[in-house]
Amino acid sequence: MRISSTLLQRSKQLIDKYALYVPKTGSFPKGFEVGYTASGVKKNGSLDLGVILNTNKSRPSTAAAVFTTNKFKAAPVLTSKKVLETARGKNINAIVVNSGCANSVTGDLGMKDAQVMIDLVNDKIGQKNSTLVMSTGVIGQRLQMDKISTGINKIFGEEKFGSDFNSWLNVAKSICTTDTFPKLVTSRFKLPSGTEYTLTGMAKGAGMICPNMATLLGFIVTDLPIESKALQKMLTFATTRSFNCISVDGDMSTNDTICMLANGAIDTKEINEDSKDFEQVKLQVTEFAQRLAQLVVRDGEGSTKFVTVNVKNALHFEDAKIIAESISNSMLVKTALYGQDANWGRILCAIGYAKLNDLKSLDVNKINVSFIATDNSEPRELKLVANGVPQLEIDETRASEILALNDLEVSVDLGTGDQAAQFWTCDLSHEYVTINGDYRS
C-alpha cells in the first residue's frame, strides 16, 4: 500500500528541536568554570572555541576517555591519548576544543598545532600535562593557529569564564558544526550513602555517526571524587551502552572523543571499584550518557524520526548489540522508515547478515519482529514476524500510523536467551544529501 502524500508530509513537518531539547536552566558541578569565544575559524563568525576548567584545588582531579577506532586518528586524538597515558588519568584540569576544523590528516604540523593548543592552556593555568585538546570540523585542513592562539588568550585574558547556565550553553554551542541545536544535559543524583552530586554533559554531532563513535565529541564532568581507574571503567562501560549504540549514517570519523573529568569538589570519600556506591554511580553515568547520546541521534542530519531498536532475549549481550547495530546502520531500513514503508523484509535482511559471534544466537524459527508505538495509542505493538512466521496480513493503516510518529521502536525478540541491547538511530532523508553535499561551502 502506498502512503498518502498528506500523511507523509505531516510526519515531515519541521520540529523545533531547539525548543524541545535545549534546557532553559540548570545546576552544574561545583568547581568547574567554562569559557568560550568566536576565534574566526568558522566562516560565519559563530562561537568556535571553548575551554572547560577545573578550579577545585581541594584534591587532585581524575580523567578518563574513549577515543575513535578509525585508523586515521586525528592529531588531537593522538595528543590527548598521550597526555592521559602520561598523567595516568590524574591531574587533568582543562579541556580546550575548537570547531570548524578537525585538524585531521594534517601530519606532523597538525600534531604540533594540537600541542600548541595544549601548551597555551597549560601555561595559562600554570600546570604541565594537564590539558586535553579536541577538534571537530572539516578533515584535511590545518588549523588557523593565529586565530586559535588569539582566541585562547582572549578567553583567559578577558576572564571570560563562568559557571552559570549561559556560560555552559555557549560552550555547548561552540563545539557545534552541522548541529541544529547545542546538546547540554545536567542532572543531580543521590547515592544510597546520601551523597549528592552533579553530572553535566555536552556533545556535538549530527552526521558521521555510527558505532565505535563517529564525528562525535562528548564531555562529562562531575564534582564527585572518583579514582582514575574506576572512572575509566565507568566511562568505558557507559560508552559501550550509549555513544557506541547510536547511528545516523554509518560513517566513523577520525576525531571521536568522549572524556570525563571528576574534580572531587564534593566532600566525600573517593569512589573506587571496591566502593559500595561504585555500581550505582556506574549505572547513573551510563543512563546519563545515554540521554546525551540520544540527543545526537535526534539531531541526525536531515532526520525526521528517532528510532529505538530494541533487541531482547539474546544469548549474549554482544550479539544482541551486533544485530541492533546491523538494523540501525541499514540504509534500506533507514530509507523505508523515512518513506513510512512497513517493509519488514529489510529488517530481517539486516538481521540475517549481522556478523554474530555465536551463530546459536539467531534461530530463524524463534524470532519475533514488531513495530512499537511510543505515543500510548493502541494497539501499541504491531507484530510483523511471529516465531519466524511473517504476518502477511498486517494492518497497513496501523503500520502507517506508527511509522508516521516522530518517535517509534523496532522490537526484535530472538527467543534464544535473556540478554538485551538497545540502539538509537534515525531515518535517512533527501535533506541529508543536501547538507553533506554543501558541507565545505
UniProtKB/Swiss-Prot annotation:
Classification via NCBIfam families: ArgJ, PRK05388.1
Catalytic activity entry: N(2)-acetyl-L-ornithine + L-glutamate = N-acetyl-L-glutamate + L-ornithine; L-glutamate + acetyl-CoA = N-acetyl-L-glutamate + CoA + H(+)
Pathway membership: Amino-acid biosynthesis; L-arginine biosynthesis; L-ornithine and N-acetyl-L-glutamate from L-glutamate and N(2)-acetyl-L-ornithine (cyclic): step 1/1; Amino-acid biosynthesis; L-arginine biosynthesis; N(2)-acetyl-L-ornithine from L-glutamate: step 1/4
Activity regulation annotation text: Inhibited by ornithine.
Similarity annotation: Belongs to the ArgJ family.
Any one GO cellular component localisation term in the record: mitochondrial matrix
Alphabetical UniProt keywords: Acyltransferase, Amino-acid biosynthesis, Arginine biosynthesis, Autocatalytic cleavage, Mitochondrion, Multifunctional enzyme, Transferase, Transit peptide
Name of the protein: Arginine biosynthesis bifunctional protein ArgJ, mitochondrial
Transit peptide: 1-8
Positions of the record's site feature: Involved in the stabilization of negative charge on the oxyanion by the formation of the oxyanion hole: T136, G137
Self-association and partners: Heterodimer of an alpha and a beta chain.
InterPro entries reported in the protein's UniProt record: Arg_biosynth_ArgJ, ArgJ-like_dom_sf, ArgJ_beta_C
GO terms assigned for molecular function: glutamate N-acetyltransferase activity; L-glutamate N-acetyltransferase activity
Leading EC class: transferase
Entry binding sites for substrate: T177, K204, T215, E301, N436, S441
Signal peptide: none
PTM (free text): The alpha and beta chains are autoproteolytically processed from a single precursor protein within the mitochondrion.
Protein species of origin: Saccharomyces cerevisiae (strain ATCC 204508 / S288c) (Baker's yeast)
GO biological process per UniProt: L-arginine biosynthetic process; ornithine biosynthetic process
Free-text function comment from the UniProt entry: Catalyzes two activities which are involved in the cyclic version of arginine biosynthesis: the synthesis of acetylglutamate from glutamate and acetyl-CoA, and of ornithine by transacetylation between acetylornithine and glutamate.
Major localization listed first in the record, in broad terms: mitochondrion
Catalytic site: T215
Taxonomy of the source species: Eukaryota, Fungi, Dikarya, Ascomycota, Saccharomycotina
Site (Cleavage): A214, T215
Subcellular location: Mitochondrion matrix
Assigned EC number: 2.3.1.35, 2.3.1.1
